[in-house]
Each structure stands twice: as C-alpha cells, then as structure tokens.
C-alpha cells in the first residue's frame, strides 16, 4: 500500500509541476519583434561576449579594437551553436509529447510550448546571424550542419539526449546570470537576446527533469 500511495503522490506532484510550467509559460510568452528586436541593431562599438566566457583578456597581444572584434566573432559563434542545438532539442521534445497525447494533457501542452519556444529561438539566432554577418568581416564559415548534428544526437538513447539537454539548459542559465547580465560594457541587444533566451530556458530545465527518468 505504501508503495502505491507513494507512486500516486509522485504522479500528483508531477501533474502540479506541469500545470505550473504551463501557467508560467503563458505569463512569460514573448515575441521576437514585438518584445525584443523592436527595430534595434547590434552595437559594434562594444564587445558581445564577456571576457569571463571569451577569455580574450588572456590574449595580451591584442589591442582594444582587435579584442572587440574577436569578442564579436566569438559572440556570433556562441549564438550559432545555440541555434544548432535547439534543432535536436525541439525535435526531442515533440517526441516526448507523443507519450502524453492520451494521458496528461498539461504535460502535452507544456512540451508543445517548449518545442515552440525552441523553434522561436532558432529563428532568433538565424536573425542574429544575418544581422551580424552584414557588419562583420567576410570569410566567416559555419561548418556544422544543424540537421546532421540533430540526427547524430537523436540516435542516442532518450536518457542520454535528455541528460545532454538538461545540462545545456543549466549552463545557459549560469552563463547569463554570472557572466553576461552583470557586464554593462557589452552590446545591449546581445545581452537582451540572451536575457530572453534565459527566461525560457529557466522554465525548460524543469521540464527536462520531469521527462528525464
């Protein structure tokens, strides 16, 4: 009896957590143009990534302009990598949602919203690439294909993919809170992109833990 009661209590707790996630998602919903971009542009007179992430301050042979340019190139790659991993994350969450189609509808809604957020993030990072690419020097190449990476990752077990996803979303939060948010010298739009990204991922990581069994 105790084991049955514990199981039922756990299922009830999980249902409550899914419900809270859905409520939070509805309150925090944002749109790229309406809430973030608003016809803004990147400030190329500033660094994009903080030195704490880029480690550019260790390259003492660079002058100020060179260090700033390298920070912007690294910021461009940083955004590209997030766009790349969002591809397999959105696909995996859609897969997870299928398990709830005839079961917990709040869990299904939470996962569909999660997937929609990841698709929105991919669009945002593509927009960033276009905007940054029009100002930065020619010659920059992106080698990894998001679909190839997604296929390779999704070939692993569900446990492994959810573990990877959870850890990615944990370091997203750490990077933003500890390294990006406190730095006033960074490009304001670059900071805001990762502020909005962080808002979603702080909710997503709770779903990762619920699905990661």
Where are these regions (language model features)?
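Inter-helical turn/loop segments and adjacent helix faces that build the functional surface
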Residues: 96-108, 132-136, 177-196, 211-213
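Carboxylate/His-rich catalytic cores and anion/metal-binding grooves
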Residues: 112, 116-136
